[in-house]
Amino acid sequence: MKRGIQLSKKSKNNKNIKEIESIKKSLVNGELIKNEDALYINNPDYFLTFSDLEISDGIDIIENIMVLSDNYISFNRENEDEPLNDVELMEITEEYKEKNDIEGGYIAQSFDKIDYIINAYDDITVITVISNDLEIQDFYDDLKVVNSWKGFNNAKVDFGQIIILNHAFSPKLLIQLYKVATKQKAKFFESLHLPLHINTILNNDDFLVIASNLPEETLDQDYIMEIGLDITNMEYEDDDIDLEEFIERIEDAVVISCEDALEKINLNIGILDYLVSEGIQIGDMVEVGMSLLENIEPSDELKEKLEKQLLKSISDRNINALLISAVRLEEDLKKGRVREIDINEKPIHFYPDELVGAAIANQIAGTKALLNFRRYSKEKPGILYGLGPILSNTFAGLIAGCMTNILEE
């Protein structure tokens, strides 16, 4: 696409379009406009950008960075059964520009939702566009769980970022900064160690734009008519900055904006989310408890008591912390993150699983629970059999403690 290289003519104003309320925010270089259909940044003095947007040449000279909501795109499509392609997105974007009297070239992206936050740091502005299908629901007492009305097979969590730099940087430097920002964003989310079912739906449709100013001399119309917009021979500010220090500031800006975006959607993780990720359900643990009853027949009343006791025990902050530590230890050992321990070699005198399981059983029901824990640990009925070595004994201790408690009542 050469959408942003040519200077555009003023588009026609369509007076028959229903007026939509828009939010406008001034930026250091440009203006952000957002309504229910789109979010776009307009800079009549032009951006030089490098991006991975759907409608983009990679390197572009444009006046508008546009993000259209999927709802708007869906409403204006002729055939929703076919996948959206770049040509159709371009046509819909052109129509939107015409309806809203938007001038100039553009790069564009479709996005499910277009909530946003702005983080500004002198010469660096980060606009994070947020699309989120997750919510935190109350489950029991203080226990909460992340869920989605779409179900996790269809849910999305995406954070698109537009990083605007109040400098005139060369395409080469923009590409370098794009790589820096992309890598830092990936490192940040990886460092969160989110549960697998959440991590799987995270940032599958995200995007990144790095935008800078054009050198001032290129804004002169006589200069453009005589020289043209030759981005290879412009006078850039690359040598005027401390690159190492600027890269550190970009990295910090990306991390802080991601942290603030997570805070905006209130996405935080608790023990039940880790249980979901491991495929451990309360009902499965109840079945384990019932399977090892001696001289007592399972009953609905007993199952209900065990379920309540399990939830009560998981709500205990001490047990909660032990369970999460076991989940994280299992993951770290599987992925070889602990240099001194290789579980593939079956190290001798290594039994943190038994220590954690025994501690949990004892915390719930005292020393009496340890006998049940040893039996559960040895026989590993039901879901315990399929868990990893750390989690198997950890949850054996949880179930043993809860069973001991309800049978003592």
Where are these regions (language model features)?
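Glycine-rich, aromatic-bearing surface loops/beta-hairpins
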Residues: L371-E409
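Long, hydrophobic, amphipathic alpha-helical segments used as structural scaffolds
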Residues: F189-L196, A261, I265, L293, ...
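N-terminal interaction modules that seed assembly of large macromolecular complexes
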Residues: N268-I324
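Hydrophobic face of amphipathic alpha-helices
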Residues: F246, I250, V254, C258, ...
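Long, charge-patterned amphipathic interaction tracts in eukaryotic proteins
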Residues: E304-R375
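Alpha/propeptide regions of enzymes that mature by internal proteolysis
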Residues: K2-K264
